[in-house]
């Protein structure tokens, strides 16, 4: 997804390496991978949306599509400051609707390709 790629390119080499390790775990374990590496995103309208959890508040929202492929939707840092302290809930409130739209678009595209 272009939204994810743009964000991924902004990461430091160390952050990209840490993410690559988590992505390898997702690839090996699939949907059963859980905490501390992955957790479910309950606020999404997609029951299968999850987040890859990296140190320092870095998160990647993703989902497995109906082909069982992991779709990386959007990433960011939930610890970014909003005033004097991090506001984790605000980050989720902002990015989950975007991730929902990206996943909707992806699913629609896959269904159109099947026709």
Tell me the role of every PLM-derived stretch.
Residues 3-7, 22, 26, 30-33, ...:
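Generic alpha-helix detector with strongest preference for long hydrophobic helices that associate
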Residues 1-22, 87, 103-104, 108-115:
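Arg/Lys-rich, positively charged N-terminal/basic patches that mediate binding to nucleic acids
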Residues 1-2, 36, 65, 77:
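Alpha-helix initiation/capping motif
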Residues 3, 18, 29-31, 39, ...:
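Residue-level signal for well-ordered alpha-helical segments
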Residues 15, 19-22, 37, 48, ...:
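Amphipathic alpha-helical interface surfaces
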Residues 25-54, 113-115:
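A short, surface-exposed loop/turn module that caps and links secondary-structure elements
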Residues 57-59, 64-115:
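Enriched for short, Lys/Arg-rich terminal
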């Amino acid at each position: 997804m272009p939204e994810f790629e743009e964000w991924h390119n902004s990461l430091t080499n160390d952050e990209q390496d840490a993410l690559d390790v988590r992505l390898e775990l997702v690839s090996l374990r699939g949907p059963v991978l859980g905490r501390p590496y992955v957790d479910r995103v309950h606020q999404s309208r997609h029951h299968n949306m999850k987040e890859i959890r990296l140190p320092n508040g870095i998160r990647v929202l993703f989902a497995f599509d109906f082909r069982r492929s992991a779709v990386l939707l959007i990433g960011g840092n939930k610890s970014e400051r909003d005033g004097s302290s991090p506001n984790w809930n605000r980050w989720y409130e902002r990015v989950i609707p975007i991730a929902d739209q990206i996943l909707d678009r992806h699913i629609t595209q896959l269904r159109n390709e099947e026709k």
